[in-house]
């Protein structure tokens, strides 16, 4: 992959926020190596993503659940979208860009079982969307940096997003723009991501679709078992009564949209992340 952007790095008195102000008088320092647009797994596999190296106790701040929520909130707040879920032509919208082993496994399973026969899907750079479902500049689409844009047409014409997240491990939950786009679009979604991903999403104040279809895949700790369960769910969803499901789920989907664009709720989740700095400092691992 190309060199990552420089990480945020500071070794200073704690930020001048109300939540941290009590530490400043004690001359406490919090040393933070931050790369919040990456997951812990990615920076572990690619240590060059986390630099400069520092030989002191410190926190590795990675994206978790809030970085891309904050990023997408600021990118799309105040915009007017034209989403229309009244006429679905395809079953799934399934977007794969950067090649990753877990993505290849699910992609091949879905393809080989014929589940994607009536779907819009990509597997860059070999398989792309039809031109009419791409933004005008998408034929020269860069490998990195423009994934957060939203084009309504593919969401309007597909019933459900298969969210192809960055990682599928069982020790963190990393949420990217891939989940926030169908939430903004008020579309159904199935997530191929980390163990307990949906549970984390609900802990952050969102709702999922367990009243409409099976979401037991979220409880599958083994990533290969999780893939098997997701394949079964998607296979059954090809026969779903989407028009009825969209009518019955209107309030739920609107709730998620409103929650996403609720600055107070976003701030609460960000403050929960900041509390990790306090817990680290209170553990007396950081020298004063």
Residue ranges and their predicted role:
Residues 26-27, 31-163, 169-176, 180-288:
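Pol beta-like nucleotidyltransferase catalytic core
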